[in-house]
Structures are given as structure tokens and as C-alpha cells.
């Protein structure tokens, strides 16, 4: 069974929950902080474990304006994940684990993407 971790900002919360439920209905094992991370647990360790876990075959990056801003400014949980994910992406010539999902575009139709994905 495929296993995915979803990286997102809370601004896409509803979209993420709908996507997670759809993936589960198609037999995908979904790891989501909202479901897995318990109060008091180290969120940075959780994110690092998810990104580096060999059983997690894909990391879906839900890209909207807020996610891109937080990633580029290294703020909040998104900023923490960016530090981990960008190292993985830059460290490998060919990578297929990290998949950006475009959740929002600007008024000109441009995708909101963090700098490390562009």
C-alpha cells in the first residue's frame, strides 16, 4: 500500500482533509500531522521522521500563497518542513518523492510555489 505525507499550511486545511480522505478511499495510507501528531510531541522531529521515512513513498506539498510565503520566510511549521525538504531536494540529482500540488494561483495565473521547488 502506498504511503504519503502531506505538507501544507493551515490555510489549505479543508482541501487537505478532502484530499486525504480521497486518497484513503483509494487505498493510500496517509500521514497527516492533524491525525498523527499528539499534543506535547516534538513537531520538528515528527516532520523530519515523515520526510526521511523510507516507507513514506511520496510527500505531497500543497502549494498556496500562505505556504509559499511561510516556506520562503522559513516561518512556522511550514518553515521547519522547508529546511528538511529543501535539503532532500537539493541533495539528490533525481528525486521523485516530493510532489508539489498547486492549490492556488495569483491574479495573473502564476502558481504559488516555494523557491526551493521553482
Task: Place the predicted regions along the sequence by residue.
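Conserved TIR/SEFIR loop-to-helix hotspot centered on a Trp-containing motif
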Residues: 65-92
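Short regulatory helix/loop adjacent to the ATP-binding pocket of P-loop NTPases
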Residues: 110-117
